[in-house]
Amino acid sequence: MKKIIKLLIISIIVSCGGTQETKDEVKTGYATEGFWERVGTIQIVNGVNVDTIYWDDLELETRPRQVKAYAGKHFAWLSNAGVNQPLNEDHPWKTGAGAFGTYTFDPESTNQDNMVESLTNNIGGSHLWGEGWQNLSKDNPLPVRFAATVTDKNYTQLAVRNVESDSIFGVDERTIGNTPEYAEYYEKIDETQATKIDGTWKHIANVRYINGVAVDTIGVPDGLDDHKIFHKGNVMVNFDFTKAKKGDPNWGGAGLSGKFTYKDNLLVETFNLSTGNWRATGGVWPPTPYDIEWIDDDSFVQIWKVVARQGENGELEFVENESKETNGLLHIRVK
Protein backbone atom coordinates (compact mmCIF):
# COMPACT_ATOMS: atom_id res chain seq x y z
CA MET A 1 0.00 0.00 0.00
CA LYS A 2 2.90 2.36 0.65
CA LYS A 3 3.93 2.04 -3.01
CA ILE A 4 0.40 2.96 -4.08
CA ILE A 5 0.40 5.98 -1.76
CA LYS A 6 3.78 7.12 -3.12
CA LEU A 7 2.44 6.86 -6.68
CA LEU A 8 -0.56 8.93 -5.60
CA ILE A 9 1.74 11.57 -4.14
CA ILE A 10 3.68 11.80 -7.41
CA SER A 11 0.51 11.98 -9.50
CA ILE A 12 -0.99 14.75 -7.36
CA ILE A 13 2.21 16.82 -7.47
CA VAL A 14 2.42 16.46 -11.26
CA SER A 15 -1.28 17.20 -11.81
CA CYS A 16 -1.02 20.34 -9.68
CA GLY A 17 2.11 21.49 -11.48
CA GLY A 18 3.91 21.52 -8.15
CA THR A 19 7.61 20.99 -7.55
CA GLN A 20 9.50 19.70 -4.56
CA GLU A 21 12.84 21.34 -3.91
CA THR A 22 15.80 19.35 -2.71
CA LYS A 23 16.94 19.89 0.87
CA ASP A 24 19.89 21.95 -0.40
CA GLU A 25 17.45 24.33 -2.11
CA VAL A 26 15.38 25.03 0.98
CA LYS A 27 16.18 28.46 2.41
CA THR A 28 17.27 28.55 6.01
CA GLY A 29 14.89 30.25 8.41
CA TYR A 30 14.85 33.95 9.20
CA ALA A 31 15.17 35.43 12.69
CA THR A 32 11.37 35.42 12.81
CA GLU A 33 11.36 31.60 12.86
CA GLY A 34 8.88 30.31 15.42
CA PHE A 35 5.41 31.01 16.82
CA TRP A 36 4.43 34.44 18.15
CA GLU A 37 1.43 35.55 20.23
CA ARG A 38 0.15 39.09 19.87
CA VAL A 39 0.08 40.83 23.26
CA GLY A 40 -0.64 44.41 22.26
CA THR A 41 -0.22 47.41 19.97
CA ILE A 42 2.52 50.05 19.77
CA GLN A 43 1.49 53.60 18.83
CA ILE A 44 4.06 55.48 16.75
CA VAL A 45 4.02 59.23 16.09
CA ASN A 46 6.57 60.87 13.80
CA GLY A 47 8.61 57.69 13.83
CA VAL A 48 8.79 57.53 17.65
CA ASN A 49 7.17 54.86 19.83
CA VAL A 50 4.92 56.81 22.20
CA ASP A 51 2.74 54.15 23.82
CA THR A 52 2.33 50.39 24.17
CA ILE A 53 -1.21 49.18 24.74
CA TYR A 54 -1.30 45.67 26.19
CA TRP A 55 -4.40 43.59 25.55
CA ASP A 56 -4.34 42.30 29.13
CA ASP A 57 -4.78 45.88 30.36
CA LEU A 58 -7.93 46.47 28.34
CA GLU A 59 -11.35 45.94 29.88
CA LEU A 60 -12.71 43.51 27.32
CA GLU A 61 -15.48 40.97 27.77
CA THR A 62 -13.48 38.50 25.68
CA ARG A 63 -9.76 38.96 25.15
CA PRO A 64 -8.89 38.47 21.48
CA ARG A 65 -6.06 36.17 20.46
CA GLN A 66 -3.80 36.34 17.42
CA VAL A 67 -0.93 33.97 16.66
CA LYS A 68 1.61 34.04 13.83
CA ALA A 69 3.81 31.15 12.73
CA TYR A 70 7.00 31.40 10.67
CA ALA A 71 8.81 28.24 9.54
CA GLY A 72 11.37 28.13 6.74
CA LYS A 73 9.96 30.38 4.04
CA HIS A 74 6.31 29.83 4.99
CA PHE A 75 4.05 31.67 7.41
CA ALA A 76 0.51 31.43 8.75
CA TRP A 77 -1.56 33.52 11.13
CA LEU A 78 -4.84 33.06 12.96
CA SER A 79 -7.07 35.45 14.89
CA ASN A 80 -10.33 34.98 16.78
CA ALA A 81 -11.10 38.70 16.98
CA GLY A 82 -14.68 39.79 16.32
CA VAL A 83 -15.76 40.81 12.84
CA ASN A 84 -15.95 44.61 12.85
CA GLN A 85 -19.27 44.74 11.04
CA PRO A 86 -22.86 43.89 12.02
CA LEU A 87 -23.27 40.11 12.03
CA ASN A 88 -25.09 38.95 8.91
CA GLU A 89 -25.23 36.08 6.45
CA ASP A 90 -22.40 37.55 4.36
CA HIS A 91 -19.81 36.68 7.02
CA PRO A 92 -18.33 33.19 6.62
CA TRP A 93 -17.33 33.18 10.31
CA LYS A 94 -18.82 34.85 13.37
CA THR A 95 -15.30 35.78 14.50
CA GLY A 96 -11.76 35.70 13.29
CA ALA A 97 -9.63 35.30 10.20
CA GLY A 98 -6.39 33.71 9.05
CA ALA A 99 -3.97 33.28 6.17
CA PHE A 100 -1.11 31.16 4.80
CA GLY A 101 1.67 31.77 2.30
CA THR A 102 5.36 32.51 1.84
CA TYR A 103 7.40 35.45 3.08
CA THR A 104 10.74 37.22 2.87
CA PHE A 105 12.43 39.24 5.59
CA ASP A 106 15.53 41.42 5.26
CA PRO A 107 16.43 42.95 8.65
CA GLU A 108 19.31 44.87 7.04
CA SER A 109 17.04 46.63 4.55
CA THR A 110 16.63 50.40 4.81
CA ASN A 111 13.32 50.31 2.96
CA GLN A 112 10.08 51.05 4.79
CA ASP A 113 8.90 47.48 4.10
CA ASN A 114 11.61 44.97 5.00
CA MET A 115 9.10 42.09 5.19
CA VAL A 116 6.75 40.91 2.46
CA GLU A 117 4.13 38.24 3.15
CA SER A 118 2.75 36.71 -0.06
CA LEU A 119 -0.67 35.29 0.81
CA THR A 120 -1.81 32.25 -1.17
CA ASN A 121 -4.65 31.17 1.13
CA ASN A 122 -7.01 32.96 3.51
CA ILE A 123 -9.80 31.89 5.82
CA GLY A 124 -12.68 33.47 7.71
CA GLY A 125 -13.48 37.16 7.74
CA SER A 126 -10.50 38.03 5.52
CA HIS A 127 -12.56 36.82 2.55
CA LEU A 128 -14.49 40.06 2.93
CA TRP A 129 -11.54 42.46 3.08
CA GLY A 130 -11.63 43.41 -0.58
CA GLU A 131 -11.16 42.03 -4.07
CA GLY A 132 -7.49 41.17 -3.58
CA TRP A 133 -8.37 39.01 -0.58
CA GLN A 134 -11.16 37.23 -2.43
CA ASN A 135 -9.08 36.26 -5.46
CA LEU A 136 -5.69 35.37 -4.00
CA SER A 137 -4.17 31.96 -4.83
CA LYS A 138 -0.82 30.24 -5.31
CA ASP A 139 -0.75 31.60 -8.87
CA ASN A 140 -2.05 35.02 -7.81
CA PRO A 141 -0.61 35.75 -4.34
CA LEU A 142 -1.49 38.91 -2.45
CA PRO A 143 1.63 40.75 -1.20
CA VAL A 144 1.28 42.43 2.20
CA ARG A 145 4.23 44.63 3.19
CA PHE A 146 5.50 45.43 6.67
CA ALA A 147 8.29 47.14 8.54
CA ALA A 148 9.28 44.39 10.98
CA THR A 149 11.69 44.16 13.90
CA VAL A 150 12.56 41.01 15.81
CA THR A 151 14.53 39.97 18.89
CA ASP A 152 14.81 36.63 20.65
CA LYS A 153 11.65 37.37 22.64
CA ASN A 154 9.68 40.07 20.80
CA TYR A 155 8.46 40.81 17.31
CA THR A 156 6.71 43.87 15.87
CA GLN A 157 5.25 44.54 12.46
CA LEU A 158 4.04 47.85 11.11
CA ALA A 159 1.99 48.46 7.99
CA VAL A 160 1.59 52.18 7.33
CA ARG A 161 -2.04 53.20 7.07
CA ASN A 162 -3.52 54.69 3.95
CA VAL A 163 -5.21 57.96 4.95
CA GLU A 164 -7.94 57.62 2.33
CA SER A 165 -9.06 54.06 3.15
CA ASP A 166 -7.61 53.60 6.66
CA SER A 167 -6.31 50.26 5.43
CA ILE A 168 -3.43 48.54 7.16
CA PHE A 169 -2.80 46.44 4.07
CA GLY A 170 -1.22 49.00 1.78
CA VAL A 171 1.84 51.19 2.24
CA ASP A 172 1.16 54.78 1.20
CA GLU A 173 4.39 56.79 1.07
CA ARG A 174 2.42 60.02 1.63
CA THR A 175 1.48 59.00 5.16
CA ILE A 176 4.91 57.92 6.44
CA GLY A 177 5.79 60.04 9.47
CA ASN A 178 2.71 62.23 8.99
CA THR A 179 0.06 60.31 10.89
CA PRO A 180 -0.13 58.04 13.93
CA GLU A 181 0.87 54.50 13.06
CA TYR A 182 0.14 51.28 14.90
CA ALA A 183 2.44 48.27 15.07
CA GLU A 184 1.33 44.82 16.16
CA TYR A 185 3.37 43.67 19.16
CA TYR A 186 4.11 39.97 19.72
CA GLU A 187 5.94 37.80 22.25
CA LYS A 188 7.54 34.50 21.32
CA ILE A 189 5.69 31.35 22.37
CA ASP A 190 7.69 28.79 24.35
CA GLU A 191 9.38 26.07 22.31
CA THR A 192 10.55 22.49 22.78
CA GLN A 193 13.11 20.44 20.87
CA ALA A 194 12.64 20.03 17.12
CA THR A 195 11.28 16.68 15.92
CA LYS A 196 11.12 14.73 12.67
CA ILE A 197 7.62 16.04 12.01
CA ASP A 198 8.64 19.72 12.21
CA GLY A 199 8.02 21.63 8.99
CA THR A 200 5.25 22.80 6.68
CA TRP A 201 2.87 20.16 5.33
CA LYS A 202 -0.09 19.88 2.96
CA HIS A 203 -2.91 17.36 3.34
CA ILE A 204 -3.45 15.87 -0.14
CA ALA A 205 -5.47 12.68 0.38
CA ASN A 206 -7.46 10.56 2.82
CA VAL A 207 -6.51 6.95 3.56
CA ARG A 208 -9.08 4.38 4.75
CA TYR A 209 -7.89 1.67 7.12
CA ILE A 210 -9.56 -1.62 8.14
CA ASN A 211 -7.98 -3.56 11.00
CA GLY A 212 -4.94 -1.32 10.73
CA VAL A 213 -4.40 -2.02 7.02
CA ALA A 214 -4.67 0.73 4.40
CA VAL A 215 -7.28 -0.35 1.84
CA ASP A 216 -8.16 2.82 -0.07
CA THR A 217 -6.73 6.26 -0.79
CA ILE A 218 -8.76 9.16 -2.17
CA GLY A 219 -7.44 12.62 -3.04
CA VAL A 220 -8.92 15.60 -1.20
CA PRO A 221 -11.73 17.48 -3.00
CA ASP A 222 -10.73 19.87 -5.74
CA GLY A 223 -10.22 23.34 -4.30
CA LEU A 224 -9.19 22.25 -0.80
CA ASP A 225 -5.89 23.67 0.47
CA ASP A 226 -5.23 22.22 3.93
CA HIS A 227 -1.84 23.33 5.33
CA LYS A 228 -0.22 22.65 8.68
CA ILE A 229 2.94 24.03 10.30
CA PHE A 230 4.73 22.09 13.06
CA HIS A 231 7.58 23.91 14.79
CA LYS A 232 9.25 22.98 18.08
CA GLY A 233 6.12 21.97 19.96
CA ASN A 234 3.74 24.47 18.31
CA VAL A 235 1.25 23.76 15.52
CA MET A 236 -1.08 25.75 13.28
CA VAL A 237 -3.67 24.59 10.72
CA ASN A 238 -5.02 26.65 7.80
CA PHE A 239 -7.96 24.83 6.16
CA ASP A 240 -9.01 26.79 3.06
CA PHE A 241 -11.75 25.24 0.92
CA THR A 242 -11.42 27.71 -1.94
CA LYS A 243 -14.51 26.55 -3.85
CA ALA A 244 -16.91 26.55 -0.90
CA LYS A 245 -19.58 29.25 -1.21
CA LYS A 246 -22.19 30.78 1.05
CA GLY A 247 -24.39 28.03 2.45
CA ASP A 248 -21.68 25.37 2.31
CA PRO A 249 -20.59 24.24 5.82
CA ASN A 250 -16.97 24.62 4.66
CA TRP A 251 -17.45 28.24 3.54
CA GLY A 252 -14.63 30.31 4.99
CA GLY A 253 -12.54 27.29 5.97
CA ALA A 254 -11.23 26.73 9.49
CA GLY A 255 -8.21 27.53 11.65
CA LEU A 256 -6.48 25.93 14.63
CA SER A 257 -3.38 26.73 16.68
CA GLY A 258 -1.85 25.16 19.76
CA LYS A 259 0.75 22.72 21.05
CA PHE A 260 1.87 19.24 20.04
CA THR A 261 4.11 16.41 21.18
CA TYR A 262 5.65 13.78 18.93
CA LYS A 263 7.55 10.67 19.98
CA ASP A 264 7.83 7.11 18.67
CA ASN A 265 5.31 7.81 15.88
CA LEU A 266 2.67 9.06 18.31
CA LEU A 267 1.43 12.61 17.69
CA VAL A 268 -0.74 14.43 20.24
CA GLU A 269 -2.22 17.80 19.27
CA THR A 270 -3.77 20.15 21.83
CA PHE A 271 -5.35 23.16 20.14
CA ASN A 272 -5.96 26.17 22.40
CA LEU A 273 -7.13 28.54 19.66
CA SER A 274 -9.89 27.44 17.31
CA THR A 275 -12.18 29.48 15.13
CA GLY A 276 -14.31 29.22 12.03
CA ASN A 277 -16.00 25.94 11.23
CA TRP A 278 -13.97 23.98 13.79
CA ARG A 279 -14.55 26.30 16.72
CA ALA A 280 -14.80 24.46 20.03
CA THR A 281 -16.46 25.90 23.12
CA GLY A 282 -13.92 28.22 24.71
CA GLY A 283 -11.68 27.71 21.69
CA VAL A 284 -9.93 24.69 23.27
CA TRP A 285 -9.85 21.19 21.82
CA PRO A 286 -9.06 18.22 24.06
CA PRO A 287 -5.67 16.52 23.50
CA THR A 288 -6.06 14.40 20.37
CA PRO A 289 -3.76 11.42 19.67
CA TYR A 290 -2.78 10.10 16.24
CA ASP A 291 -0.57 7.32 14.95
CA ILE A 292 1.95 8.53 12.36
CA GLU A 293 2.89 6.24 9.49
CA TRP A 294 5.85 7.57 7.52
CA ILE A 295 5.94 6.94 3.76
CA ASP A 296 9.34 8.64 3.50
CA ASP A 297 10.97 11.68 5.13
CA ASP A 298 8.72 14.01 3.14
CA SER A 299 5.34 12.29 3.50
CA PHE A 300 3.31 10.69 6.28
CA VAL A 301 -0.21 9.57 7.16
CA GLN A 302 -1.80 11.01 10.30
CA ILE A 303 -4.14 8.23 11.50
CA TRP A 304 -7.07 8.94 13.82
CA LYS A 305 -7.01 6.97 17.07
CA VAL A 306 -10.26 8.46 18.36
CA VAL A 307 -13.63 9.57 17.00
CA ALA A 308 -14.89 13.15 17.20
CA ARG A 309 -18.49 13.70 18.27
CA GLN A 310 -20.75 16.21 19.99
CA GLY A 311 -21.14 15.49 23.68
CA GLU A 312 -24.31 15.73 25.77
CA ASN A 313 -23.44 19.29 26.75
CA GLY A 314 -23.01 20.24 23.10
CA GLU A 315 -19.23 20.54 23.30
CA LEU A 316 -16.78 18.75 21.04
CA GLU A 317 -15.37 15.57 22.54
CA PHE A 318 -13.27 12.63 21.41
CA VAL A 319 -13.99 9.00 22.29
CA GLU A 320 -12.12 5.75 21.69
CA ASN A 321 -12.66 4.32 18.21
CA GLU A 322 -14.29 0.91 18.69
CA SER A 323 -14.79 0.33 14.97
CA LYS A 324 -12.53 -1.78 12.77
CA GLU A 325 -12.31 1.17 10.41
CA THR A 326 -10.44 4.44 10.78
CA ASN A 327 -9.13 7.19 8.54
CA GLY A 328 -5.79 8.84 7.98
CA LEU A 329 -4.70 12.14 6.45
CA LEU A 330 -1.89 11.87 3.90
CA HIS A 331 0.51 14.84 4.08
CA ILE A 332 3.45 15.89 1.93
CA ARG A 333 6.16 18.31 3.00
CA VAL A 334 5.92 21.78 1.44
CA LYS A 335 9.36 23.14 0.61
Which positions does each model-derived feature cover?
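Lipid interaction determinants
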Residues: 19-104, 108-259, 263-335
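Compositionally biased, low-complexity segments enriched in small residues
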Residues: 1-2, 206
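Sec-dependent signal peptide recognition
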Residues: 2-10
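C-terminal motif of bacterial Sec signal peptides marking the signal peptidase cleavage site
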Residues: 12-15
